[in-house]
Amino acid sequence: MNSTFADQVITFNKNLQYTGALPEGFDVLNPYLDNPETMDVMKKFYHKYYNDSNKRKFIIGINPSRHGAGVTGVPFTDTKRLESICGIKMKSAHTHEVSSVFMYDMIAEYGGPEMFYKEIYINSPFPLAIVRKTKNGWLNANYYDDKKLFEAVKDFMIDSLKKHISLNLDTSEVFILGKKNAGFISKLNKEAQLFDTMTVLEHPRYIQQYKSKEKQLYIDKYILALKK
């Protein structure tokens, strides 16, 4: 029996680990190792929405946040929306994440999670949460925040993107969240020739925090780009 899209994503997540070097002051969190329930809810999510072998469009985030995919194992999905929209309850954690709010408002207008996830797969080039040590404790970090950090994780990111593509993703056009992210993905693409066209969309966190009055405009922009 051929394995489904869901089976392959679950296998990818199960085997996910970063063993490379990191510059001082950075660390990587692996939600699947830190909380056994994360593995359970992630499996439920992919079995629910990805139990087929359809080709899908690929949306690329940055890296999981501690409160979104860093808890649920599902990109741009906090526990609130995992339960209220996807019907999957998480008992060991309760999180609210601004990016998740925008993403699920957009998904609702796209046609709902069944339709959206049937056609689209979201993940990150660095699929684990990165944190940075500050005097106030550990805070979220992006893979591109530090030149040494990017150089350290670059090969791992190319390898991860290739694994995502092998799930059966459409590489003729890829959708990248965040302009700065797109600049770095473009560097990886030059080196590894992964995608033909790169379409850049504003990052959900940026929209929620700085452009909330124009949110509908951005929802329309996403849907227009993804449905064309």
Locations of regions flagged by a protein language model:
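A polyanion-binding, active-site-adjacent surface
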Residues: 2-173, 182-186, 209, 217-228
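An amphipathic alpha-helical core segment
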Residues: 179-193
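Cofactor-binding loop segments of dinucleotide-utilizing enzymes, especially the Rossmann-like FAD-
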Residues: 62, 179, 203
